[in-house]
Amino acid sequence: FKDLRDPIRFVLDHQLMPAQDLKTLFWQSFVPLNSFLSIGPPVQRLQELVALMEAGVVTLLGPDMTVEIEEAYCTYSKRFDDTRYHATQLIEARIPSTAIRRTNNSLLRQLLNDRIIHPHQLAIPNEVPFETGAIAIDPETNQILGPDDRPYPTLYCFGIPTEGIHWLTAATAQPGTDAWNLRKADQIAADLLHHTF
């Protein structure tokens, strides 16, 4: 499957999918399925999780998990809301989706407040624009787009804040490969070195 990563990135980088398909088929369907099937903890951690489940220490809920605060925490799956669990402690152990509007990063927050950066949006015909969660950048150069959607000449962003334009931005480079993220870093460095200040 990893052999498909670069062709998929090519499709994304060259905007070869209609925005509606990009939203529903890629970001909302394929990406979660890919994450579930091909990205995850090592086998040993899964075995440890299964042991905790079998011991009754850990319970996995179904989709659309909801947490409410009554006298204690109450959690349940919206699809199976007849089974509810109560606890005095709650541990959140999921990786949230990328969302620049919800970032806790003080630098990104300040750039957002100062309107130097803004969220990337997909324009979908007959729909409200879809915010991908990424910072608006030029997908080819990774230059940050200003309020007028023109790239800043020397302001770049790559990696996790661009997830929603690029894909698998948190993936680590594997030895012996021409890793996408290292190519992007090289491209940005070369652009900066050739820029006249």
Which residues are covered by each model-predicted region?
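Flavin (primarily FAD) cofactor-binding/catalytic cores of flavoenzymes
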Residues: F1-T196
